[in-house]
UniProtKB/Swiss-Prot annotation:
Belongs to the bacterial AtpI family. It is a multi-pass membrane protein. One of its GO terms (biological process) is proton transmembrane transport. Its main location: membrane. It comes from the Bacteria. Keywords: Cell membrane, CF(0), Hydrogen ion transport, Ion transport, Membrane, Transmembrane, Transmembrane helix, Transport. Pfam families: CGL160_C. This is ATP synthase protein I. A possible function for this protein is to guide the assembly of the membrane sector of the ATPase enzyme complex. It is found in: Cell membrane. One of its GO terms (cellular component) is plasma membrane.
Length: 115
């Protein structure tokens, strides 16, 4: 389980770093409103990642299969972006995909040989 907790910390930290870099970049290239839309989606991705890790941690101890509660985060954020006129769906959705970028960074670090 120590490896699992290390992986969770690493993915969460990488997601936070990527989120900060992308937020600053979007703010500079576009505007603050678009950057805040991105930040909303990225924050939802951190919540999603935490819920997913908690469900995986419980797997085998308390339950036999993964729950679907983490999917509620995605649905709620996309519905919020669609209903609220100040929010834009694309930056929110791309912000949500930040955790996937963190997984890609982790994969590249483990696959590619270190110097």
């Amino acid at each position: 389980m120590a490896e699992f907790y290390q992986l969770c910390r690493e993915l969460f930290t990488t997601s936070l770093v990527l989120m900060a870099i992308a937020f600053g970049t979007v703010w500079v290239i576009y505007d603050l409103n678009t950057a805040l839309n991105y930040l909303l989606g990225a924050s939802a991705s951190l919540i999603y990642l935490r819920l997913l890790a908690r469900n995986v941690e419980r797997l085998g101890h308390d339950q036999k299969k993964l729950g679907k509660t983490q999917l509620l985060v995605v649905v709620a954020v996309i519905i919020l972006a669609a209903r609220w006129h100040e929010l834009h769906i694309i930056p929110v959705f791309l912000g949500f995909l930040t955790y996937k970028a963190a997984i890609l960074v982790y994969m590249l670090r483990t696959v590619l040989p270190s110097p």
